């Protein structure tokens, strides 16, 4: 009996064109299982099938939460627009730019938030949000590149978390899949999620 061919959420060429598979020249032990190969120039290439599978898992996981109880955090410039669009579509909360220390741990702060899940763009750059979420027992979902540690990350989405087009397609797919799970219309294009140059 022939094994059924895997069906991607988008054609694999769309993933490749967006550069989701482009890792870094550093590989952590945590990310080893998500590496497809290493190029001759030393660049690690991420496995797009594992990304596709994790997008499905993350969409199911996030769709279980009340939208307003999902907090997205992204310091990286190219993640601002995709995070804002995801939040508009899904109805989640977000913080782009600087994450104020104490946002998740200090009820005296005016910026204090009480999410039930935190979704960070990069656990290295957004480490303050990750450590605060961990300290108060909030699960963490993170986009992780080949150089990221997944310590304190409960659900890894293995992808290029730096590229403008890569971020657009990943957040677009997550928003689309969550909308599909919730039975909501989704009329946005990938370009709607893409940061300006």
Curated annotation (Swiss-Prot):
Question: Which CDD domains does UniProt cross-reference here?
Answer: RPS2 (cd01425)
Q: Name one GO biological process term.
A: translation
Enumerate the UniProt keywords alphabetically.
Answer: Ribonucleoprotein, Ribosomal protein
Q: Which GO terms describe its cellular component?
A: small ribosomal subunit
Under Gene3D superfamilies, the record lists: Glucose-6-phosphate isomerase like protein, domain 1
Pfam families referenced in this protein's UniProt entry, alphabetically = Ribosomal_S2
Question: Superkingdom of the source?
Answer: Archaea
> What is a single molecular function from GO for this protein?
structural constituent of ribosome
PANTHER family hit by this protein:
40S RIBOSOMAL PROTEIN SA (PTHR11489)
The UniProt entry's sequence similarity note says: Belongs to the universal ribosomal protein uS2 family.
For this entry, the protein name equals Small ribosomal subunit protein uS2
- Source organism per UniProt: Archaeoglobus fulgidus (strain ATCC 49558 / DSM 4304 / JCM 9628 / NBRC 100126 / VC-16)
């Amino acid at each position: 009996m022939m094994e059924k061919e895997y069906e991607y959420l988008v054609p694999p060429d769309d993933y490749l064109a967006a550069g989701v598979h482009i890792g870094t020249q550093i590989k952590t032990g945590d990310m080893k299982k998500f590496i497809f190969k290493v190029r001759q120039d030393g660049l690690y290439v991420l496995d797009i099938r594992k990304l596709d599978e994790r997008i499905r898992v993350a969409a199911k996981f996030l769709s279980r939460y009340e939208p307003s109880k999902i907090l997205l955090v992204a310091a990286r410039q190219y993640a601002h627009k995709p995070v804002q669009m995801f939040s508009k579509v899904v109805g989640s909360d977000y913080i782009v730019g600087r994450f104020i220390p104490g946002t998740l741990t200090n009820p005296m702060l005016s910026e204090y938030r009480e999410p039930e899940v935190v979704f960070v763009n990069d656990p290295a750059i957004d480490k303050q949000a990750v450590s605060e979420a961990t300290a108060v027992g909030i699960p963490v979902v993170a986009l992780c590149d080949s150089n990221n540690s997944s310590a304190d990350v409960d659900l890894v989405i293995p992808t290029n978390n730096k590229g403008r087009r890569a971020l657009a397609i990943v957040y677009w797919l997550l928003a689309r899949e969550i909308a599909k799970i919730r039975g909501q219309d989704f009329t946005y294009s990938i370009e709607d999620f893409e940061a300006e140059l």
